[in-house]
UniProtKB/Swiss-Prot annotation:
Coiled coil (residue ranges): none
Protein name as it appears in the record: Nucleotide-binding protein XAC3671
GO cellular component: cytosol
Intrachain disulfide bonds: none
Signal peptide: none
GO molecular function, one term: nucleotide binding
Record-linked SUPFAM superfamilies: YajQ-like (SSF89963)
Function, in words: Nucleotide-binding protein.
Keywords, ordered alphabetically: Nucleotide-binding
Keyword flag Nucleotide-binding: yes
Species name: Xanthomonas axonopodis pv. citri (strain 306)
CDD domains, sorted: YajQ_like (cd11740)
Amino acid sequence: MPSFDVVSEVDKHELTNAVDQANRELDTRFDFKGVEARFELEDGKVINQSAPSDFQIKQMTDILRARLLARGIDIRCLEFGDVETNLAGARQKVTVKQGIEQKQAKQLVAKLKEAKLKVEAQINGDKLRVTGKKRDDLQDAIALLKKADFELPLQFDNFRD
């Protein structure tokens, strides 16, 4: 039976490149000259932003978003934490979401059932496996999920016929 997997993943290599480019842009921008501002990537899951002030953190967030979009990374996978300010400066943690959470996977399954397509969906950890008797049904399911607006980026892989 034909099947495919629905996943929500971020290419770690592209993420590293985007963070490096954002740091390079900080080094060349006039409004960040002589300022201790940095992006740091931890384990490919968390991006730490640090700068002297809250205002500069907001500017850095715009730079990060632009660099991620330029590298083809959907910014819906980012979860911005609160800005922590003290006398030494400001910090913000940006979490990169990987995988489909249980609640969101149930929403995807409900969307497929609601459309009454001849496909079955099952949740496998942080991904969703969709199977059907015909390839056309699977292609309709992919089109439906692409058209629907979920708060996370979806990729379709492991298409088997």
